[in-house]
A protein has these predicted regions:
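WD40 beta-propeller blade core
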Residues: 39, 79, 119-122, 162, ...
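A short beta-strand motif characteristic of beta-propeller blades
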Residues: 6-12, 47-52, 87-94, 127-135, ...
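Short loop/turn segments that connect beta-strands within beta-propeller blades
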Residues: 42-46, 82-86, 123-127, 165-169, ...
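Ankyrin-repeat and related helical/solenoid repeat scaffolds used for protein-protein interactions
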Residues: 147-191
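Beta-rich, blade/repeat-based domains predominating
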Residues: 12-24, 55-65, 95-108, 114-115, ...
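Blade/loop signatures of beta-propeller domains
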Residues: 1-4
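Conserved beta-strand positions in repeat-built beta-propeller and related beta-rich domains
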Residues: 30-35, 70-75, 112-117, 153-157, ...
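Blade-level signature of beta-propeller repeat domains, shared across WD40, Kelch, NHL, RCC1
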Residues: 181-212
């Protein structure tokens, strides 16, 4: 099914290369590869709450165990950062070395890693990165998020956000959005995305995903 969604909330941000996006329960965090930083903001007011320097920002961002995890560096490693101190507390290698890791999301299921070149999203054990399962995607993966029932990924060039049913791995919905989505995040009601084209964080409502 194909569906077109207009944004219900737009937040302009001071960023030149919007990459990653994650929701921590109260704040949206986004990463900017041009300014090499990770930024927290209040989605209600748009107020910036914190800026953390992060050299080598590449693509997506997630939060787990009270820390942030950013895809960073030439080899797209998983860099774990303490959001309070801004210090790097750990680095793990790209689970598929040499491939284009773009999407990253930590959920109760495990750690999701999405690859643009392979068109796959892997679910991995967050402790040792052991592969649990793999979902094939129809489009290149730019960013990843998940609810309890659905896995969602962004296609930057196709300007779509696509939903996969976690029960059977079928792609059930393709949502056409404004701009070019990169990082995406689900806040329990809305799917937010980084619009690379207009330097904004934008939110859409997707039928059937709210509360899922």
């Amino acid at each position: 099914m194909v569906y077109a969604a207009g944004s219900v909330r737009d937040i302009p941000v001071r960023a030149l290369r919007l990459c990653g996006l994650t929701w921590t329960g109260q704040s949206l965090w986004y990463s900017d590869a041009m300014n090499d930083e990770i930024v927290a903001l209040d989605p209600a007011s748009g107020e910036v709450l914190r800026r953390i320097p992060c050299p080598g920002v590449r693509t997506d961002l997630t939060a787990t165990g009270g820390n942030l995890v950013q895809v960073a560096g030439e080899h797209r490693a998983l860099r774990t950062i303490d959001p309070d101190s801004g210090q790097t507390v750990g680095v793990r290698g790209n689970p598929r070395p040499g491939h284009v890791l773009c999407g990253l999301e930590a959920t109760r299921h495990g750690l999701w890693t999405g690859y643009e070149d392979l068109r796959v999203i892997d679910l991995r054990d967050p402790e040792d990165l052991r592969l649990i399962t793999t979902f094939q995607t129809r489009r290149p993966v730019a960013g990843v998020t998940a609810s309890d029932r659905y896995l969602a990924y962004a296609d930057y060039r196709g300007a779509t956000i696509n939903l996969i049913d976690l029960d059977d791995g079928a792609e059930v919905l393709s949502v056409t959005v404004h701009g070019n989505p990169t990082g995406i995040a689900w806040d329990g009601t809305l799917i937010w995305y980084c619009d690379f084209a207009t330097f904004q964080l934008r939110a859409i409502e997707v039928p059937g995903i709210a509360g899922s």
